[in-house]
Amino acid sequence: MLNKETFLGEAFKRLPKELINKIKNKKIGIAGAGGLGSNIAVALVRSGIQNLIIADFDKVEYSNLNRQYYFYKHVGQYKVDALEEQLKNINPYINIEKHNIYLDENNFDIFRNCDIIAEAFDKAENKEKIVNYAVKNKKYIVSGVGMAGDYSANIIQTRKLGKYLYISGDLKNEATDENGLLASRVAITANHQANMILRILQNKYEV
């Protein structure tokens, strides 16, 4: 295996040099490791992020394989463990702090030392709670809302709602029994979130 310096030089040589210098010591919190969280984490690691805190209580199920960044072999594993494996297959030198816990207002403080939080929950009430935590603590948070169905990808956007809150998605199409989730729209939303995180880290606050 290549040593760290050589590997990072090769792996990141196509990235903007300004980006690499600004993000190399930054830490991102990933709240949820499902369809949004797993894809956000992959995009960030491929973009040069080297420090992550990832939290989720769930295990990989067969029904996750249609949109989450896991493979057949991961079914039955805790998502935080499976995602760590996936990310270290991209960059073996990244630093990952993982928490196999159900996130709520009693433990959001695991993200207190993060520069930005990526919100990747399923339920609206949980999204609201962590957004309130982040804004109260003057911490940037990028949330995902509205990515279900096979609607046009062009209605997925990122919006700035206040100094610390950004929301990616179409803001209306949530998953139901009739309105399922496609890998394409979930990944587009997740990559909107990842891209906004990278912009904020470079002090580019406009969407």
What feature does the model see in each segment?
Residues 80-86, 90-114, 121-124:
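A structured beta-alpha segment of the ubiquitous adenosine-cofactor-binding alpha/beta core
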Residues 2, 27, 109-116, 120-207:
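Glycine-rich phosphate/adenylate-binding loop
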Residues 46-51:
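Conserved S-adenosyl-L-methionine
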